[in-house]
């Protein structure tokens, strides 16, 4: 898409690049707060795989979580690579960045946006403005959208379409800074699995990727992965796309949920990659009596909509014990827990795992923790 942009330097000034010239090599990427370094690692790995040099990457450039700023490389190629990332939500090409005055911020935003040159707006039949606001202000994101949208309509005369626009302009406010961007992703990249069964609560695919990232999965042909709280199947589907040779197993205490996960797997074309069954994670020895796994990656109940009746101290203790028995020597357990203090206490008390990494992430307005644990093997095990 032809695009005239204002290249944003790190000192906040702008430099215009014409639609015929080379686009500036800057990207603004969003993810779950707490996963910024996961995005960085994935991007650098994809650049290495493509034979491209590393680029400058800044985490949380505006002081708020879930942000990654990228500079370097050829702009369109970098955008293509960014659009393939599995750990992110949206990709933006910055157009203009400016500081907001203490008074009259909305008017200032409207004035700045009205004179902004965006070649894509010249030919677009429809557009929309979206906004995210972080910090303390006397206005909301909807106010920003209305004022910026009115400015672009006056400038270009392009019709507004809030559902399916040709062009989406993002106007974000971070404290006293405003960033105007061209949004390359019309829907979140974390919403990549089309399901027949969509539960009310499902793990975001981006967070599933992060769990797999912390598992440090290798490339052995006989490696196996289990999700004993598989739900609708997000972790297994993510693993199926990333690791073509990994044998996948899933279980859930609810037979209906298992049936729905099978339907989802069929819809995604990966039913042949995984074995799903009904079973209680507190009794994995009975569910998988003859099988041990290299990795267990899972998302146990948080105790909000599901698992409200559980004694989580006993629950986590039993799950840790069963995971230890079902993991091979050298195995790894990665899970996300909302009641993280209880989980930490259970992990220390059982003494079956060594904590390798712990991370707070934001997902769905909650702040659970990812735990990556290595199995503590007994002498003489094989």
Residue ranges and their predicted role:
Residues 62-120:
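Conserved AdoMet
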Residues 2-46, 50, 54, 58-67, ...:
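Class I S-adenosyl-L-methionine-dependent methyltransferase catalytic core
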Residues 105-115, 122-161, 169:
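Long recognition/docking surfaces used for binding and targeting
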